[in-house]
Amino acid sequence: VTRAAWLASSAALVAAMTAGAGSARGRAVHVAATSHAEALSPLSPALCPVGALPDGDACVRIQPGDDDAPEAEAEENAHHDRRGRWIVYDQIPRRPDRPADYDAYRYPVPCEHGCVVSGYDLDRPDDAQRRGRHLSHVGHGAVDLPQKKGTPIAMVALEHQVGDAEVVYVGPLFGTTVLTRHTLREGNQLRDYLLLFGHLDAPATGLAPGGHLKEGDVVGFVGDTGSPELVHLHLEARRIREGVDLTRLGPGAMIDNENSVVCDPRNVLPLR
């Protein structure tokens, strides 16, 4: 997708949006003091073993349910990076049971038909991945959602999610960025995922690592930081590798292939 085509698509979408975005900027974000087990807890989910969540000062094992998502298998792929180097990486493609149509999903911003202008393509061969001039864009492990600047971004609970999302980072990364951790039932176990909200105009007031976000809570506001004149939400999903302690990592390391695996967002986004 060229820059000109991207701009044309996003301009058409934004022009069709009539809902105002600025009125919600003053809305205070709900930062809950509860753990994923809905109880006050000094424990972080990261301190409990796989298959368990904190409840008070103890870890309680969660029994798998019949509604668990199937195990999403990581696959190896490769592409040429911006410098032309051949880079091998892991990625989790869309599961066959998940709809291919991006319009089948709910997003953290207002989205009707055709609002995804750039989708996930890291499962494709190198020459079929997104390209810009001079390889300025190499592959795309997310969805891009053009919006009016300042549009509120509302948290969505992921498919098979247990408890609320935990804020793990707020600051510069993909422009102004918020990273949240979500625990999902998957393959008869609990797996942790990251959601990356990129290019924000600003995070929600009071948002900080350690806070929790419920469905509908404001994460931040759409902008173009780190992506001048391309006002959009970059929404990326990553599965945290087992044994990785995010509290010991900086934001760049959190999204490194060694610590988390990029995932087609359609595997985890809620259906309409």
Residue map of PLM features:
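Sec-dependent N-terminal signal peptides
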Residues: 2-23
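Signal peptide processing junction and immediate N-terminal pro/mature segment
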Residues: 19-34
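Surface-exposed, glycine-biased beta-strand/turn segments
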Residues: 36, 40-176, 185, 215, ...
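Acidic, glycine-rich catalytic/binding loops that coordinate metals and/or anionic ligands
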Residues: 63, 73, 82, 190-193, ...
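Active-site scaffold segments
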Residues: 143-145, 198, 215, 220-221, ...
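Solvent-exposed coil/turn segments that connect beta secondary-structure elements
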Residues: 148-150, 183-185, 225, 238-242
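Zn2+-dependent peptidoglycan hydrolase active-site motif and core
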Residues: 156, 160-206, 231-232, 236
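Short hydrophobic beta/alpha edge segments that flank linear recognition/processing sites
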Residues: 178-180, 213-228
